[in-house]
Amino acid sequence: MTATLQRESVGTGRVVWFTGLSGAGKSTLASALYEELIARGEQVELLDGDAVRENLSKGLGFTKADRDTNVRRIAFVAGLLAKHGVTVLVSAISPYAETRREVLANLPNPTEVFVDAPLAVVTERDVKGLYLKALAGEIPHFTGVSDPYEAPENPDLHLRTDRISVQDGLKQLLDHLGVNA
């Protein structure tokens, strides 16, 4: 039996989906927004791609099919929460445009945020050295190096984290979401 999400919402929740390369700043911005919304008394949950992969998608690899399955699992949980009035922040690479479009089309009140930084910047930010290993061919299926990252063509918000601070990004997020001070 396959469960699908419908756009009908019983609550006033929404899903803010942060997508971008590893190291672009998705988790940083999502966490900053999470803290701000909690401080304002909103019901909010943060679904981090790494945590979901560890807990709900353990055993999945990094093939396109496995990545798509992981994204669909995240979207399923996000949709359930949002339908009950929760603002859900999703921080996940979600590398394939078609899969992102599919899941966003079935989520209540979705906002796609493209967290963008050039490869040179994310490589410099990478304290584990994963990009350098991937560029040297030591890590197969690495998004942005040996596997594609398909940038959103028309995201709701495009944040260039190599050009703005976390505080500026947070302000743009709050303005876009209509959650002004």
Swiss-Prot record:
Its EC number is 2.7.1.25. Pathway: Sulfur metabolism; hydrogen sulfide biosynthesis; sulfite from sulfate: step 2/3. GO terms for biological process: hydrogen sulfide biosynthetic process; sulfate assimilation via adenylyl sulfate reduction; sulfate assimilation, phosphoadenylyl sulfate reduction by phosphoadenylyl-sulfate reductase (thioredoxin). One of its GO terms (molecular function) is sulfate adenylyltransferase (ATP) activity. Keywords: ATP-binding, Kinase, Nucleotide-binding, Phosphoprotein, Transferase. Gene3D superfamilies: P-loop containing nucleotide triphosphate hydrolases. It is an enzyme of class 2 (transferase). It catalyses: adenosine 5'-phosphosulfate + ATP = 3'-phosphoadenylyl sulfate + ADP + H(+). InterPro entries: APS_kinase, P-loop_NTPase, Sulf_AdTrans/APS_kinase. GO terms for cellular component: cytoplasm. The active site is at 94 (phosphoserine intermediate). ATP binds at residues 20-27. Belongs to the APS kinase family. PANTHER family: SULFATE ADENYLYLTRANSFERASE. Catalyzes the synthesis of activated sulfate. This is Adenylyl-sulfate kinase. It comes from Deinococcus deserti (strain DSM 17065 / CIP 109153 / LMG 22923 / VCD115). The lineage of its organism: Bacteria, Thermotogati, Deinococcota, Deinococci, Deinococcales. The gene is cysC.
